From Swiss-Prot:
The fibrinogen C-terminal domain is sufficient to mediate endothelial cell adhesion. Residues 237-455 form the Fibrinogen C-terminal domain. Acts in part as a hepatokine that is involved in regulation of lipid and glucose metabolism. Proposed to play a role in the trafficking of energy substrates to either storage or oxidative tissues in response to food intake. Has a stimulatory effect on plasma triglycerides (TG), which is achieved by suppressing plasma TG clearance via inhibition of LPL activity; the function seems to be specific for the feeding conditions. Involved in angiogenesis. Binds to endothelial cells via integrin alpha-V/beta-3 (ITGAV:ITGB3), activates FAK, MAPK and Akt signaling pathways and induces cell adhesion and cell migration. May increase the motility of podocytes. Secreted from podocytes, may modulate properties of glomerular endothelial cells involving integrin alpha-V/beta-3 and Akt signaling. May induce actin filament rearrangements in podocytes implicating integrin alpha-V/beta-3 and Rac1 activation. CDD domains: FReD. Keywords: Angiogenesis, Cell adhesion, Cell projection, Coiled coil, Disulfide bond, Glycoprotein, Heparin-binding, Lipid metabolism, Secreted, Signal. Induction: Down-regulated by insulin and leptin. Not regulated by nutritional status (fed/fasting) Up-regulated in podocytes by puromycin. Up-regulated after feeding in the hypothalamus. Predominantly expressed in liver, weakly expressed in kidney and lung. Expressed in podocytes (at protein level). Expressed in hypothalamic neurons (at protein level). Expressed in bone marrow sinusoidal endothelial cells (at protein level). In part proteolytically cleaved by proprotein convertases; proposed to be involved in activation. In primary hepatocytes is intracellularily predominantly processed by FURIN and extracellularily by FURIN and PCSK6/PACE4. In 18.5 dpc embryos 75% of protein is found to be processed compared to 25 % in adults. It is found in: Secreted; Cell projection, Lamellipodium. This is Angiopoietin-related protein 3. It comes from Mus musculus. InterPro entries: Fibrinogen-like_C, Fibrinogen_a/b/g_C_1, Fibrinogen_a/b/g_C_dom, Fibrinogen_C-term_domain.
């Protein structure tokens, strides 16, 4: 800038020095040599000014060039950012399209599942009706078979007996196939339901809004009948001094495990097995250990009790109810699997009367294995010949009397005693097992169910 000002100052001087000689001659003739020297000095000054101006312009150009380069770099960065933003926007649009397609697919699958569920329920109802009809036919055929065997002409009618047996087996196989089909359809429905829930969960995360084995075993056989557990009731005059449960027996100084007679309040006296191995008294209500006792019993026997107190037994629902009406009790389950690992779980519980099908309501309080009994749910007891209204055919399919949930297959400590790897898969499902929700199934080798008052 200073150079430019100097240049503007020098230029007029140079111009003034170049005045026409004819005009300057009017002043004085002898001054001509002095004017020439003045013009040379002015030219030098002008040249110097121009040189400085050139350097100044050069510096200005360099600075301007640097600023322009900075501007271009910023423009390039902006262009790259805009390009990246455009790519990301396109990706988001593609993801949105994909999610919308997924949502449409989900809606279609949901409709398919609903239709399948309706169809499955219809098939299940028809299968159950058909099964009931087949059971009536089988019972009628069994009666005919019994009459044929007992009749004097039974030996002569052997071909007819063989034919009846063959027909019964065919009907049994038909029931097995039908129930297996229902089981497979239930599994498919459960898998699709889980897939739908997973997709819905993903959709909720993106902000765009739009099962245990439920298997039914195949075979329903009539169980052999075992005599009810003997009460060994004592005379009324002797019952007043009897303890109310095994805790009362223990408090009287009897610290050895064994069979004792107790008399709960408002009940007759009966024998129980008191277990003191853990250092505290427990009243056993069920024991499984070797399969010597068949537990696929009738409702009447499950109410009265069956088996041997020094072996495998079920104490009886009536006696269990009489015990637990006296106080608040803890239900303890001790389980041993086929790897000889020992587990236990304890529940606080409430047991209903005969009128409620001995409804069980539990809440887990302790244990080293997850509980498989549904908590805070009414579980009604049922057997193959006594089923609460609305329940599935769990006892017929899985064997034994138990507190069943809305679905079968979660747990059953009164099932058929099966050794591992000796039976087919349907038979294993009818065995003794414990399956916490969404976890592995424990095949049980031995089990104990026992009671102890909380106070």
């Amino acid at each position: 800038m200073h150079t430019i000002k100097l240049f503007l100052f020098v230029v007029p001087l140079v111009i003034a020095s170049r005045v026409d000689p004819d005009l300057s001659s009017f002043d004085s003739a002898p001054s001509e040599p002095k004017s020439r020297f003045a013009m040379l000095d002015d030219v030098k000054i002008l040249a110097n000014g121009l040189l400085q101006l050139g350097h100044g312009l050069k510096d200005f150009v360099h600075k301007t060039k640097g600023q322009i380069n900075d501007i271009f770099q910023k423009l390039n960065i902006f262009d790259q950012s805009f390009y990246d933003l455009s790519l990301r926007t396109n990706e988001i649009k593609e993801e949105e399209k994909e999610l919308r397609r997924t949502t449409s697919t989900l809606q279609v699958k949901n409709e398919e599942v609903k239709n399948m569920s309706v169809e499955l329920n219809s098939k299940l109802e028809s299968l159950l009706e058909e099964k009931t009809a087949l059971q009536h036919k089988v019972r009628a055929l069994e009666e005919q078979l019994t009459n044929l065997i007992l009749s004097p002409a039974g030996a002569q009618e052997h071909p007819e007996v063989t034919s009846l047996k063959s027909f019964v087996e065919q009907q049994d196989n038909s029931i097995r196939e039908l129930l297996q089909s229902v089981e497979e359809q239930y599994k498919q429905l459960s898998q699709q339901h889980m897939q739908i829930k997973e997709i819905e969960k993903q959709l909720r995360k993106t902000g765009i809004q739009e099962p245990s084995e439920n298997s039914l075993s195949s075979k329903s056989r009539a169980p052999r009948t075992t005599p009810p557990l003997q009460l060994n009731e004592t005379e009324n005059t002797e019952q007043d001094d009897l303890p109310a449960d095994c805790s009362a027996v223990y408090n009287r100084g009897e610290h050895t495990s064994g069979v004792y007679t107790i008399k709960p309040r408002n009940s007759q006296g009966f024998n129980v097995y008191c277990d003191t191995q853990s250092g505290s008294p427990w009243t056993l209500i069920q024991h499984r250990k070797d399969g010597s006792q068949d537990f696929n019993e009738t409702w009447e026997n499950y109410e009265k009790g069956f088996g041997r107190l020094d072996g495998e037994f079920w104490l009886g629902l009536e006696k269990i109810y009489a015990i637990v009406q006296q106080s608040n009790y803890i239900l303890r389950l001790e389980l041993q699997d086929w790897k000889d690992s020992k587990h236990y779980v304890e529940y606080s519980f409430h047991l209903g009367s005969h009128e409620t099908n001995y409804t069980l309501h539990v809440a887990e309080i302790a244990g080293n294995i997850p509980g498989a009994l549904p908590e805070h749910t009414d579980l009604m007891f049922s057997t193959w010949n006594h089923r609460a209204k609305g329940q599935l055919y769990c006892p017929e399919s899985y064997s034994g009397g138990w507190w069943w949930n809305d679905i079968c297959g979660e747990n059953n400590l009164n099932g058929k005693y099966n050794k591992p790897r000796t039976k087919s898969r349907p038979e294993r499902r009818r065995g003794i097992y414990w399956r916490p929700q969404s976890r592995k199934l424990y095949a049980i080798k031995s089990s104990k169910m026992m009671l102890q008052p909380t106070t």
